[in-house]
């Protein structure tokens, strides 16, 4: 097991449902520490840059529109195997396929409005964390 950090975003649909606290409880109950957090309303430019890896995909425009539709909660999670733990907590991208008890099964409405984002690998996590948080604003506890 490795101590890792991962980026998590609670997307506009889940923020609008007022379930930030319930999602944070799941992180903490799984042994993940929230070592940085902020609320933001992403600009189109930031959303396009953050999701640039998907720029050629057919869903890119809809993804950007959704991510700028309301505020998001962005956090860095730290813990043993944080990336995998967070991905297990989130569940499948499509909430209809997500296991019962996962964040997406419980709070997401569709494959587009799917409540949360999480880094998928250590290198992705490093890039995504640096995008939203200068290193001096992330604190181990």
UniProtKB/Swiss-Prot annotation:
It is found in: Cytoplasm. GO terms for cellular component: cytoplasm. InterPro entries: NDK-like_dom, NDK-like_dom_sf, Nucleoside_diP_kinase, Nucleoside_diP_kinase_AS. Its cofactor is Mg(2+). The gene is ndk. GO terms for biological process: CTP biosynthetic process; GTP biosynthetic process; UTP biosynthetic process. This is Nucleoside diphosphate kinase. The keyword DNA damage does not apply. One of its GO terms (molecular function) is metal ion binding. Homotetramer. SUPFAM superfamilies: Nucleoside diphosphate kinase, NDK. Belongs to the NDK family. It catalyses: a 2'-deoxyribonucleoside 5'-diphosphate + ATP = a 2'-deoxyribonucleoside 5'-triphosphate + ADP; a ribonucleoside 5'-diphosphate + ATP = a ribonucleoside 5'-triphosphate + ADP. Pfam families: NDK. It is an enzyme of class 2 (transferase). Major role in the synthesis of nucleoside triphosphates other than ATP. The ATP gamma phosphate is transferred to the NDP beta phosphate via a ping-pong mechanism, using a phosphorylated active-site intermediate. The active site is at residue 117. HAMAP family: NDP_kinase. Keywords: ATP-binding, Cytoplasm, Kinase, Magnesium, Metal-binding, Nucleotide metabolism, Nucleotide-binding, Phosphoprotein, Transferase. It comes from Burkholderia thailandensis (strain ATCC 700388 / DSM 13276 / CCUG 48851 / CIP 106301 / E264). ATP binds at residues 11, 59, 87, 93, 104, 114. Its EC number is 2.7.4.6.
């Amino acid at each position: 097991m490795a101590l890792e950090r991962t980026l998590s975003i609670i997307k506009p649909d889940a923020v609008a449902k007022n379930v930030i606290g319930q999602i944070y409880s799941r992180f903490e109950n799984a042994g993940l520490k929230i070592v940085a957090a902020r609320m933001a309303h992403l600009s189109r430019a930031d959303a396009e840059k953050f999701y640039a890896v998907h720029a050629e995909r057919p869903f890119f425009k809809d993804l950007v529109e959704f991510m700028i539709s309301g505020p998001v909660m962005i956090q860095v999670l730290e813990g043993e195997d944080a990336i995998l733990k967070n991905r297990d907590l989130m569940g499948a991208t499509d909430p209809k396929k997500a296991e019962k008890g996962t964040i997406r099964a419980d709070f997401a409405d569709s494959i587009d409005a799917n409540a949360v984002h999480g880094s998928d690998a250590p290198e992705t996590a490093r890039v995504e964390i640096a995008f939203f948080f200068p290193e001096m604003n992330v604190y181990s506890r």
